[in-house]
């Protein structure tokens, strides 16, 4: 089992609703995920439905959005369509928005895909089929490339982990806690590297931290 990508339901969304969604989204004016085109440039596009818990004007355009809202027994932070165009590539990376240990999880529902999509999580290729529901822990290294000739469109949601969400996932085991420890260690090393690269002496940094804490504790 891949700890970073877990198949939750095989038939989460019916084919008729998938086809309806493809018709509804056909004329949407896609926007780049990153305005500065940091990842994949114009090859990675988005259609936001919920942003920071708030529905966008796009939400009521799609019947699928309402179905998802009814199905999910948890808080949805973000809900969006992501389109990876042919030739698009997002290099290996990790982020904490979907780290179960930090209280978040990212869920994917493929709307349209093709056999030449190469989605890799924790160094293992993950093949997602249309209509399935997948849980992705984004704290594991992941990447995606679309070598096919069709767009790869997923409905993606960031949710807050609660008891209902936890029941969708395998029980936490020693590997889970070792992974969290690994992330903390990586964060510490990155933190340390940042300050040493700025020629900031450790004792000076600790002095700044001490004064900041003292200020917060004793300010009136």
Explain the meaning of each model-derived region.
Residues 1-73:
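Non-heme Fe(II)/2-oxoglutarate
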Residues 81-100:
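Conserved short histidine dyad/triad with adjacent acidic residue
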Residues 110-129:
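A short beta-strand-loop-beta hairpin characteristic of the jelly-roll/cupin
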Residues 171-220:
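Membrane-proximal basic amphipathic "stem/tether" segments
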């Amino acid at each position: 089992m891949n700890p970073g990508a877990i198949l939750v339901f095989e038939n989460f969304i019916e084919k008729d609703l998938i086809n309806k969604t493809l018709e509804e989204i056909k004329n949407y004016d896609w926007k780049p995920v990153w305005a500065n085109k940091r990842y994949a440039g114009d090859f990675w596009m988005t259609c936001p439905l919920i942003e920071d818990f708030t529905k966008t004007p796009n939400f009521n355009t799609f019947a699928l959005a309402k179905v998802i809202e009814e199905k999910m027994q948890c808080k949805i932070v973000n809900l969006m369509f992501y389109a990876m165009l042919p030739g698009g590539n997002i290099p290996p990376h990790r982020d904490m928005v979907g780290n179960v240990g930090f209280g978040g999880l990212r869920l994917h529902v493929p709307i349209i895909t093709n056999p030449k999509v190469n989605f890799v999580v924790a160094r293992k290729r993950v093949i997602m089929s249309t209509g399935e529901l997948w849980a992705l822990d984004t704290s594991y290294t992941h990447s995606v490339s679309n070598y096919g000739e069709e767009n790869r469109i997923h409905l993606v949601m960031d949710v807050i982990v609660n008891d209902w969400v936890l029941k969708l996932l395998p029980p936490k085991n020693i590997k889970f806690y070792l992974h969290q420890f690994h992330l903390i260690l990586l964060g510490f090393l990155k933190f340390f590297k940042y300050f040493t690269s700025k020629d900031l002496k450790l004792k000076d940094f600790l002095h700044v931290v001490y004064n900041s804490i003292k200020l917060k504790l004793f300010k009136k």
